[in-house]
Amino acid sequence: MRDGEGIWGRGRTGGHAHPKEAMHTTFFILGGTMLIGVISDTHLYDRAFELPKAVFDEFSNVDLIIHCGDVTDKEILDSLKDLAKVVAVKGNMDYLNLPRKEILEINDIKIGVIHGDVVYPRGDRLKLRLLGKEMGVDVLISGHTHTPFIDDCRDILLLNPGSPTVPRCPLKSIMKLSVEDKLEAKLIPIEE
């Protein structure tokens, strides 16, 4: 949704969900495209000292930011909130009061957000797909592995933005989503 192309509303059901339950947030887009920044495993300040400036540059034009957990410090969420609305879930390293799961509904697309630490072996795509089916979502976004992927796993799109600070592959990364009638995902490498 860029430059007055439309308006959007947000409705949240469920109040404060039990940590095992999913919060449910609904977005309505009228006449435009919604841009979403996706980030995970920032690990400030336990493993990294700062978020690269390139993350803020890439997210400067988004309507919403999703953080898939292992935030580890509330300050990063506050910094991201200066750019856009933020939806975040709790990771295995977080002590913040965040839900374990979130379901976003953007027009007719249901997006599940989890950290992914409940999936073993770590990042197993089949188990992620089954979890997405259980949540009733079209797209499941997770973190935890610090390794990015975009995988159209039969009937569920599986996404992981990797980590912009402590990757487990050579690539530091985030992700951007564009949602209109369909969802398109793009992996964004983060340069130092």
Curated annotation (Swiss-Prot):
CDD domains assigned to the protein according to its UniProt record, in alphabetical order: MPP_YfcE
Pfam families reported in the protein's UniProt record: Metallophos_2
Key words, A-Z: Hydrolase, Metal-binding
Keyword Hydrolase applies: yes
UniProt GO MF annotations: hydrolase activity; metal ion binding
Cofactor info, note text: Binds 2 divalent metal ions per subunit.
Record: residues binding a divalent metal cation 2: 70, 92, 115, 144
Name of the molecule in the record: Probable metallophosphoesterase MJ0623
